[in-house]
């Protein structure tokens, strides 16, 4: 948008606005997908261990968090190894 268009009050066409927004979204997604795993995974794992430990005695090694991307599908897998129940 030029200065003259701005001063005269001419508006951008909706198609060009939509195209610019799509380019921004695509650039954002591409930059985020280049990284292997999200930054929040270690914190998520620690918090899960803390919450589960309130109810069941587990070690940090008993919980595994795995994040995987395939094409446009993202999978967050959480595996928890629970201790065997003892008879009372």
UniProtKB/Swiss-Prot annotation:
Domain of life: Bacteria
GO biological process, one term: cell division
Cystines in this chain: none
Record keyword Cell division present: yes
Name of one Pfam family that matches: MinE
Function in brief: Prevents the cell division inhibition by proteins MinC and MinD at internal division sites while permitting inhibition at polar sites. This ensures cell division at the proper site by restricting the formation of a division septum at the midpoint of the long axis of the cell.
Family the UniProt entry places it in: Belongs to the MinE family.
Protein name: Cell division topological specificity factor
Species name: Acidovorax ebreus (strain TPSY) (Diaphorobacter sp. (strain TPSY))
